[in-house]
Swiss-Prot record:
Family: Belongs to the INKA family.
A cellular-component GO term for this protein: nucleus
Compartments (UniProt record): Nucleus; Cytoplasm
Its biological purpose: Inhibitor of the serine/threonine-protein kinase PAK4. Acts by binding PAK4 in a substrate-like manner, inhibiting the protein kinase activity.
Disruption phenotype: No visible phenotype in most cases: most mice are viable and fertile. A low percentage of mice show exencephaly.
Tissue occurrence: Expressed in tissues of the developing head during neurulation.
Protein name per the record: PAK4-inhibitor INKA1
Organism encoding this protein: Mus musculus
Protein's GO biological process: neural tube development
Binding partners and assembly: Interacts with PAK4.
Region (Inka box 1): 163-200
Record GO terms (molecular function): protein serine/threonine kinase inhibitor activity
InterPro entries: FAM212, Inka
Additional observations: Expression of Inka1 is not regulated by AP-2-alpha/Tfap2a, as it is the case for orthologous protein in zebrafish and Xenopus.
Amino acid sequence: MHSARLDSFLSQLRWELLCARDTGSPPMSGPLQPKPRTDQNVQPKRQFRASDVLEEDSVCCVEEEEEEGLVAEDKGLPLGCPREHALDWDSGFSEVSGSTWREEEPSVPQRQAPRERPPHSQRFSVSDIPMRSRAAVTNIPPAHRPRPKSTPDACLEHWQGLEAEDWTAALLNRGRSRQPLVLGDNCFADLVHNWMELPEATSEGSDGDVPRARARPPQFLLGLSEQLRRRLARARRTAMASKRLSCPPRSEPDLPADISRFAALMNCRSRQPIIYNDVSYL
């Protein structure tokens, strides 16, 4: 921190020397003052350019001095004390919420304000050219800066003006907007009640007057007809099975169990297997 202060003091001293040299003050005595050179070839336009260079050097020196001062202040702050501009962003509270964020924040110890310096436009007016000043932005206190609102508070402000019974119409009209809709805990029941007019439930006494046959759904009758159709189709398929065969089965006459029957079965061209139980002839 001491080195930063020493650097800022040296840069301030250098700036004062440059300003005294540019404004045409009497020459300072000392080994640092260079001897004036009298040259006839030097044109006033070149002198004006040299003054411009000195002015730019002084501007750079002052900007470096301001940056070093800010760094020194950041290093000098304790760890427990955050900077004021860090509180300007969204901390969860806003103007719409219960209390302001300035009332609930802990008190920040005030530091000793540094000595005021002349404005940027008054420091450098050697060539009568107005300089741009950055003091207009830095002089605004953080308490008066516009602070952005959080998303829930903005949505609450947008839907706060709607009445309790008119939010359904607003939802239908603003359905294509990207802003969310703030509803209550029973929002689904409200939607069902308002958009779908549900019939009232009938009493138990009225249910007794209606016969049970009418209360059955038609799906039961459709199921019975489907089962009957399947049974009829199965019986028809069994009756038509013999007509679809190329060699319909037919009953054969009973033959005597002897060698003549075996010979007859061997000579015929039937595809049925030959089953012969009497093997006495073998």
